[in-house]
Each structure stands twice: as C-alpha cells, then as structure tokens.
C-alpha cells in the first residue's frame, strides 16, 4: 500500500506541475504491459456453464487494503477464446498506475473481465446470468481478505451493456453503481424499477449504427430515470461523434466504450471530444480532471455483505424487456430525436 501512496503522490505532483499534461498517452504507452498483468480465472460450473475471466489484482505483499471490484463485460464477437475479452477495448488502462490512483479511498481496484461462452454460441444470453454471478461470488471468496464487497461495480459495452443491465436487475443489492455502454437491450418498466436505487452512468454514440441512440438508448435512459430515486447521481454521456481521446474518429459510431476506457477525458486532460454529459435531472455536468468515470464509480457504496446468491436471481425481472411494438419504437425514435434537436 505504501508503494501505491507514493505513486499517487507523484502522479498528483506531475499533474499539478504540468509534467503529466499528456497523461492519457503516457498510460496508452503502458497498455500492452497492463494487459500482460491480467491473470486467468474461472468460476464454478453453474447450471451447466462455467464463466472464465481475466483479472487484474492491485494487492501488494502484506497489503491489508480492501479494494473495490470492477466487472467488465465485452461485446458480441469479442469473447471467442479466453483472454480475448480485453483485446478490442482499452479497459486494461484501468490497471495502470495512473488510473488505479483515481479509485477513491483505496487507490486501486480489481478489474475482472468476464467472458461470454461464444464458442457455445452464447452472447451474454440469460442462461449465463447465474453462472456469471457464481463466478463473481467465487472470486470474492478467493480474495476475501482484500475485497470491499460494498463497492462492486459492473459495466460493459453492446451485448456486455445488455448483460450489465440484466445483472443489475437480477441482483440490485450487489452493485454500488453500474455503467452500461451502448447497451443492446431496452429494459421494461418492471426491470428499471429494480434499478431505482442504483446510480447509473449510461454512454452512447448519437450515430451508433447498431444500437440506435434515439429508439433504444435514449428510451432506456428515460425509463431508468422515470423510476430512479437517485437522479442527481445518474449520468448520461452522449457522443455526437465517437472519437478517440486525440479527436480522431473511431472505426465505428458504435465504439463509444473508448470514451469510458479513457475515463471521459481528452488526450490533453480536458473534456472528452464531441461529448455531452447530463445528470438524471437534465442538468449539464462538467468533469474536472482527473475525476471522471472512475471517481464517480468509486464514490458509491452498497449494503451488500458478500452473501452468495442462493438461486438464479429474479428471472422474471431480468427477462422483461420493453415492448417490441413497431409503432411504439417509431414514436420513441421521433420523440427522442426532436428532444435531442430542440433541447440540445
């Protein structure tokens, strides 16, 4: 822990003096090393499936610190074999010293990147909800001396964003905050009611060609906020253009996870390019470097005590999506489009 405090202090000094003005790229240079620091793990077989994962551990020798866990869930096609789930995104940046230092109260966190069993043609299907919970429970037991069970966070992109929402709906007591990115699921009102006390940070690209911003993502946000008891704590990040932190276009408007991977800051440590951030009351939110997504996450705790799940969770709730009625979808699309145009 002493090493982590020294590292955090040096990073703070460098940021204040301007030495670290290109912090994002300094971290990016360490990305390969960060990915190599992840270890392999696998959960117990549950309902016929065992979820494997790779994880980063912040624990040092003789370390008694309690660290939060960040669960990261990949998108479709990014989990064909073990270890592949951290390759398409830059989530490994969160394992670097700079990003680890942003976790409030611990100056570090476990990063657990789980894998959907795509070789079985499973893309975060509902049948993996309980096996994923079992893998998380097992990880907590194996690392009980250093896990802060009151600070478990979950996020992911595309199909992983869908699974983020479904896990939170199935087990709302477990997660202190969640951060779905371009989630490929439109939860119904019975589902979003179960998220009422969970802070949610939703991120999406306005031009997303796969998960439509206006008919899917904005409607998901509206449904969540309509039921939320913590509106002021919720965040909605909209990316007019989906860019890398240096302002260059990503390969697709679907790739909004890079903004989250870089903690919503540009290469110059300013606002992430082409982004807009609001809270659940519609108020614009200004981020001040280095307090981005990580600082937001780590500021929340839950009452979860680490008790293992006794069953498959609330299957009725996590299976309930919003109506697929075409007319309703079209209405939502234009309602949200006009709101975006006229309200900004």
Please describe what each predicted stretch is.
Residues 150-194:
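Primarily recognizes the serine-hydrolase "nucleophile elbow" in alpha/beta-hydrolase
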Residues 60-65, 120-158:
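Gly/Ser-rich "nucleophile elbow"/oxyanion-hole loop immediately N-terminal to the catalytic nucleophile
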Residues 5-24:
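Sec-dependent N-terminal signal peptides of Gram-positive bacterial secreted proteins and lipoproteins
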Residues 69, 73-133:
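Active-site machinery of serine-nucleophile hydrolases
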Residues 203, 207-209, 215, 226-340, ...:
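C-terminal catalytic histidine-bearing segment of alpha/beta-hydrolase fold enzymes
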Residues 73-80, 116, 140-141, 157-159, ...:
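Cell-envelope and extracellular/periplasmic
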Residues 23-69, 155-157, 162, 167, ...:
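A domain-start/cap signature at the N-terminus of enzymes
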Residues 84-85, 212-224:
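Short alpha-helix in the alpha/beta-hydrolase fold that links the catalytic acid
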């Amino acid at each position: 822990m002493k090493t982590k405090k020294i590292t955090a202090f040096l990073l703070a000094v460098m940021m204040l003096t301007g030495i670290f003005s290109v912090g994002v790229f300094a971290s990016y240079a360490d990305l390969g090393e960060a990915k190599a620091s992840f270890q392999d793990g696998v959960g117990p077989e549950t309902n016929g499936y065992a979820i494997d994962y790779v994880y980063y551990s912040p624990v040092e020798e003789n370390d008694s610190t309690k660290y939060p866990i960040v669960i990261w869930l990949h998108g479709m096609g990014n989990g064909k074999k073990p270890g592949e789930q951290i390759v398409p995104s830059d989530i490994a940046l969160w394992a670097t010293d700079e990003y680890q230092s942003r976790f409030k109260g611990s100056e570090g966190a476990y990063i657990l990147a789980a894998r959907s069993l795509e070789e079985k043609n499973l893309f975060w299907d509902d049948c993996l909800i309980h096996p994923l919970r079992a893998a998380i429970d097992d990880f907590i037991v194996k690392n009980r001396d250093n896990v802060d069970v009151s600070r478990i966070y979950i996020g992911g992109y595309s199909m992983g964003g869908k699974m983020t929402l479904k896990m939170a709906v199935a087990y709302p007591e477990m997660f202190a905050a969640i951060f779905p990115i371009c989630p490929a699921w439109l939860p119904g009102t019975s589902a979003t009611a179960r998220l009422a006390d969970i802070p949610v940070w939703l991120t999406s690209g306005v031009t997303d060609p796969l998960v439509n911003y206006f008919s899917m993502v904005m409607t998901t946000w509206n449904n969540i906020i309509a039921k939320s008891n913590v509106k002021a704590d919720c965040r909605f990040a909209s990316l007019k253009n989906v860019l890398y932190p240096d302002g260059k276009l990503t390969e697709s408007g679907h790739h909004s996870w890079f903004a989250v991977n870089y903690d919503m800051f540009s290469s110059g440590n300013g606002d992430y390019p082409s982004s807009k951030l609001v809270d659940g009351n519609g108020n614009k939110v200004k981020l001040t470097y280095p307090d981005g997504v990580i600082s937001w996450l780590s500021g929340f705790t839950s009452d979860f005590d680490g008790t293992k799940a006794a069953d498959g969770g609330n299957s009725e709730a996590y299976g309930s999506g919003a109506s697929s009625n075409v007319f309703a979808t079209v209405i939502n699309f234009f309602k949200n489009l006009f709101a975006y145009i006229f309200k900004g």
